[in-house]
């Protein structure tokens, strides 16, 4: 479902307070990774990685298993600290100086491949939990997060509309289809008004119709949030990607349109030649 301007305004991420800018980073860039490397027991999982994502961009990351895709997302979210390099959210926020929780609060939301919703709670309650996530799960289960104000309720209504679950708000999450659970988790991230979404293989296990709806959802959201999608399903990548980055052995092997990377001889040899 296409977003009208009112919905776009409501979903627009909260901008951080102005700090000292990194002058190497353009104001158009939301994610900046420069010369990033990390090793585990002598194995270089990320090797001199340089990656920039623009505000509102939807970028697909592809590559063979072990290429460094998960480690890259771990570094962005603070789960893994690199041995070398710089990682910034926009011009002002040095992610390497922040904890995982601080990074999440700064505006980076991550969705893993398997949906992680609270199945014993309703769709409404899952979204309520997300909007007041800083209160903690203990407080949430005792109902303190249910007292949303009018603005928060309006915002939730809009998120439900965007993810296509407005008619299931009082359903338990356990009765939702796999695709609906994925959309609910995306909605939970949207409740926090992120600047950047990291989404890992969102369409695995979905029906054809759910895949089509997910493609529409992500392309509609791009522009308000920047989105990085890690995906192996090349047909899905074809539906959503304007620009594709191919990772191999921890660094960028190729970058460009899907057509450009599919015709790149190195990409064919190390990835697409395997039947992808």
Where are these regions (language model features)?
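Conserved structural motif at the start of ABC-family nucleotide-binding domains
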Residues: 26, 31-33, 46
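ABC ATPase NBD Q-loop/coupling interface
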Residues: 86-106, 143-146
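The feature captures the beta-strand-to-loop junction immediately N-terminal to the Walker
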Residues: 62-64
């Amino acid at each position: 479902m296409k977003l009208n301007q009112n919905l776009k305004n409501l979903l627009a991420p909260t901008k951080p307070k102005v700090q000292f800018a990194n002058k190497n980073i353009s104001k158009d860039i939301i994610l900046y990774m420069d010369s990033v490397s990390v090793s585990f027991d002598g194995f270089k999982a990320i090797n001199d990685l340089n990656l920039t994502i623009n505000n509102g961009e939807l970028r697909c990351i592809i590559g063979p298993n072990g290429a460094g895709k998960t480690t890259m997302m771990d570094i962005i979210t603070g789960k893994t600290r690199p041995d070398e390099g710089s990682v910034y959210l926009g011009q002002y926020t040095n992610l390497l100086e922040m904890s995982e929780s601080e990074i999440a609060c700064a505006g980076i939301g991550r969705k893993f491949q398997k949906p992680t919703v609270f199945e014993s709670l309703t769709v409404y309650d899952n979204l309520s939990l997300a909007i007041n996530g800083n209160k903690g799960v203990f407080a949430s289960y005792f109902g303190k997060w249910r007292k949303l104000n009018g603005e928060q309720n309006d915002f939730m209504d809009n998120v439900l509309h965007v993810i296509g679950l407005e008619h299931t708000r009082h359903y338990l999450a356990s009765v939702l289809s796999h695709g609906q659970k994925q959309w609910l988790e995306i909605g939970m991230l949207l409740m926090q008004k992120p600047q950047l979404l990291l989404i890992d293989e969102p369409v695995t296990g979905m029906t054809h119709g759910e895949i089509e709806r997910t493609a529409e959802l992500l392309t509609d959201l791009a522009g308000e949030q920047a989105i990085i999608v890690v995906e192996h399903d090349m047909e899905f990548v074809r539906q959503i990607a304007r620009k594709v980055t191919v990772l191999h052995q921890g660094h960028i092997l190729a970058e460009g349109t899907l057509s450009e990377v599919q015709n790149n001889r190195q990409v064919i040899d190390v990835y697409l030649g395997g039947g992808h």
